[in-house]
């Protein structure tokens, strides 16, 4: 039997994802950049259900408006019932890549009409795992992207990037090549061009798949620990704070997740593993140290987590 073509392989992947996660959904959106991954996904999605393409113009390149309009025209030609271009402002805070990602996801969330299909591939997952590992960002980063994290859907997370490129070729589509993807100033671009090929050569291949398997295993373990922390949190509460004595009786991975959930519920944002461990030290290595500062969801202020009379407490202070 002949091996299925690239487009058929993608269609099978999207259909399987839809059956597993989106059975009752009548329509969906696709985040379309014009690149080969999202373009191939759009082609498949539009053949399966009524599809709205959402194109986010970050305005980071001189021809970004033209690229967005080309993507819109391609979406309509591929059978999308609608296609809209959303222009966003990228503030650059936290680095250009991170700022663009925040702006993109905010725009998609605000303008979506149903679940949002994203064109992330197995290669993207491997890159994400390596970035998280290199930055010491904790288990959540190394666990990579979830296939289904409503409203975000990643039906191609098990497919290699080469398959989406081949699917575009089968359809005769000319995909946009984002210059940022080959710009060595960006860490992900260097991982893609230099680090992963070297690892594949040194380790004899299969590295991308191995990294993705590792992400899946870590994600499953992490979800179990999150569930244990959710059960433990009510017993540790002391009003708006947390009882140190109750926290001290928990296993370290569960305790840190209880602390994380408490911080997030209190309005913390952008939490790092270092910050969570700093708050954890207020429980396990208490010597009268000061509070731990964390980001706040409200502009113009910071949150502080400290210990007082055997209780962890949160308070806000204006940014000066």
UniProtKB/Swiss-Prot annotation:
EC number: 6.3.4.19
Binding positions for ATP per the UniProt entry: 33-38
Compartments in which it is found: Cytoplasm
Catalysed transformations (reactions): cytidine(34) in tRNA(Ile2) + L-lysine + ATP = lysidine(34) in tRNA(Ile2) + AMP + diphosphate + H(+)
GO CC terms: cytoplasm
Enzyme class name: ligase
Keyword terms, alphabetized: ATP-binding, Cytoplasm, Ligase, Nucleotide-binding, tRNA processing
One GO biological process term: tRNA modification
Main localization category: cytoplasm
Superkingdom assignment: Bacteria
Family membership: Belongs to the tRNA(Ile)-lysidine synthase family.
Record function comment: Ligates lysine onto the cytidine present at position 34 of the AUA codon-specific tRNA(Ile) that contains the anticodon CAU, in an ATP-dependent manner. Cytidine is converted to lysidine, thus changing the amino acid specificity of the tRNA from methionine to isoleucine.
Name of the protein described by the UniProt record: tRNA(Ile)-lysidine synthase
UniProt source species: Mycolicibacterium paratuberculosis (strain ATCC BAA-968 / K-10)
């Amino acid at each position: 039997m002949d091996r299925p073509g690239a487009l058929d392989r993608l269609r099978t992947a999207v259909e399987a994802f839809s059956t597993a996660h989106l059975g009752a959904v009548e329509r969906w959106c696709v985040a379309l950049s014009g690149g080969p991954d999202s373009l191939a996904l759009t082609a498949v999605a539009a053949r399966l259900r009524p599809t709205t393409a959402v194109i986010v113009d970050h305005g980071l390149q001189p021809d970004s408006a033209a690229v967005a309009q080309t993507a819109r025209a391609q979406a309509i030609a591929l059978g999308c019932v609608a296609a809209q271009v959303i222009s966003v402002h990228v503030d650059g805070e936290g680095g250009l890549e991170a700022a663009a990602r925040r702006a993109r996801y905010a725009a998609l969330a605000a303008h979506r009409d149903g679940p949002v299909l994203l064109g992330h591939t197995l290669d993207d997952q491997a890159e994400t795992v390596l970035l998280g590992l290199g930055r010491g960002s904790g288990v959540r980063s190394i666990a990579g992207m979830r296939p289904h994290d409503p409203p975000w859907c990643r039906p191609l997370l098990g497919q290699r990037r080469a398959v989406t490129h081949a699917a575009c070729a089968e359809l005769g589509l000319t995909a946009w090549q984002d210059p940022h993807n080959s710009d060595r100033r960006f860490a992900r671009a260097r991982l893609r061009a230099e680090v992963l090929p070297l690892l594949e050569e040194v380790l004899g291949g299969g590295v991308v798949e191995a990294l993705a398997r590792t992400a899946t295993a870590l994600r499953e373990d992490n979800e179990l620990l999150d569930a244990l922390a959710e059960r433990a949190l009510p017993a540790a509460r002391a009003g708006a704070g947390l009882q140190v004595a109750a926290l001290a009786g928990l296993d370290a991975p569960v305790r840190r997740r209880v602390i994380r959930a408490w911080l997030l519920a209190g309005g913390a944002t952008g939490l790092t593993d270092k910050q969570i461990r700093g708050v954890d030290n207020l429980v396990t290595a208490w010597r009268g140290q000061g509070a731990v500062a964390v980001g706040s969801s409200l502009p113009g202020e910071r949150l502080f987590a400290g210990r007082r009379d055997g209780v962890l407490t949160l308070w806000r202070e204006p940014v000066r």
